Swiss-Prot record:
NDH-1 shuttles electrons from NADH, via FMN and iron-sulfur (Fe-S) centers, to quinones in the respiratory chain. The immediate electron acceptor for the enzyme in this species is believed to be ubiquinone. Couples the redox reaction to proton translocation (for every two electrons transferred, four hydrogen ions are translocated across the cytoplasmic membrane), and thus conserves the redox energy in a proton gradient. This is NADH-quinone oxidoreductase subunit I 2. [4Fe-4S] cluster 1 binds at C63, C66, C69, C112. One of its GO terms (cellular component) is plasma membrane. It comes from Nitrosospira multiformis (strain ATCC 25196 / NCIMB 11849 / C 71).
Amino acid sequence: MNRIKDFFRTFLLFELIKGMMLTGRNMFARKITVYFPEEKTPQSPRFRGLHALRRYPNGEERCIACKLCEAVCPALAITIESEQREDGTRRTTRYDIDLTKCIFCGFCEESCPVDSIVETRILEYHGEKRGDLIYTKQMLLAVGDRYEEQIAKDRAADAGYR
């Protein structure tokens, strides 16, 4: 009996008809189109865009040069050099992120013990030359300073899940 059913399903192209019905149903459904530069879709607080380095409220940079983000980066996009300061703490002298290599996975953000490196909601950035997409420590700190309010809001919204 099952052989007969299988024969008719195969002979009558049941799967093909089922697929054509699905296509026909969606062909006449309302289209959803977002005209991107003019219209923007809502973003999640967890959106992974352009990187930023944060500072403490007293103005000191948060990065303690533990190099966990450099070690965990699967694309090897982060380069860190550090020095010992006179007070015994370690701070970065060089912190570069090559955005041409970065895959925006967020591992650097997750591994940071002091919430220094974060990924912002910024997705519109460009470079005219390859070197323009290598962000230095000063550039990352400038992004962090400029968007600190939004970063703090996003971190607060996500705090319950961390």
